[in-house]
A protein has these predicted regions:
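Ordered, amphipathic secondary-structure segments that act as subunit-interaction surfaces
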Residues: 61-113
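Short, charge-patterned binding micro-sites
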Residues: 38-69, 101
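Long, contiguous binding/interaction regions
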Residues: 47, 130-153, 159
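Residue-level detector of conserved catalytic or cofactor/ligand-binding positions
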Residues: 172-177
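Extended, well-folded interaction surfaces typified by the phenylalanyl-tRNA synthetase beta subunit core
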Residues: 2, 7-9, 13, 17, ...
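Short beta-strand-to-loop capping motifs
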Residues: 8-10, 68-74, 114-119, 168-170
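The conserved catalytic core of RNA pseudouridine synthases
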Residues: 152-170
Length: 177
């Protein structure tokens, strides 16, 4: 049994598909495709899959990943890509299918590109000058202070007409002591 990573992009109206709905979409697409995927055992067997770093509702993406176990010994990755793209809903395109090189929970960094009105550029640039940005992180049980600069060291701005775009390379997993 091999674990396969399906990379896909989500654009336009597909960006409003939530994680739970995306799981349903992938389950249905994989069933319709007839590809040899592994199902869990038990009373309610379903396709076992793991999403790496899912985005919030309304966010477009150029690369999201889902890991799926296959029953095939040597899967034809190009066939998987073609079969999945043939039945994907509008706005979702499979860009790559490949064997997993690292587990989804080991992916530690993500790059986000965000657009803001150009009038806000000055405020965004002030972030880079700050030495410390303490942020309160709330959970169900408690609240703790996290240093944001450790996870988002700097913002890189580019002007795009009336808007300014900035890229964030951020640490996703915050290690707990």
């Amino acid at each position: 049994m091999i674990t396969v990573r399906i990379s896909f992009e989500k654009k336009n109206e597909a960006s409003y598909i939530s994680l739970l709905d995306m799981q349903r979409v992938m389950q249905r697409i994989l069933k319709r495709s007839g590809l040899p995927v592994w199902h869990t055992l038990g009373f309610n067997p379903h396709i076992y899959m793991t999403f790496a770093c899912p985005l919030s509702l309304g966010q477009e993406s150029e690369c999201e990943c889902v890991d799926v176990k296959t029953e095939a010994e040597q899967p034809d990755f190009e066939h998987w890509k073609t079969a999945l793209n043939a039945i994907m809903p509008a706005g979702i395109v499979v860009t790559k299918v490949a064997p997993v090189e690292m587990k989804a929970d080991l992916i530690a960094y993500a790059c986000y590109e965000i657009s803001y009105p150009a009038a806000e550029a000055e405020k965004l640039m002030q972030y880079n000058a700050l030495e410390s940005v303490p942020v309160e992180k709330k959970s169900k049980r408690n609240t703790k202070t996290v240093e944001l600069k450790e996870h988002v060291p700097a913002l890189e701005l580019t002007e795009a007409g009336e808007r300014v775009q900035f890229e964030i390379l951020s640490l996703i997993h915050i290690s707990e002591p």
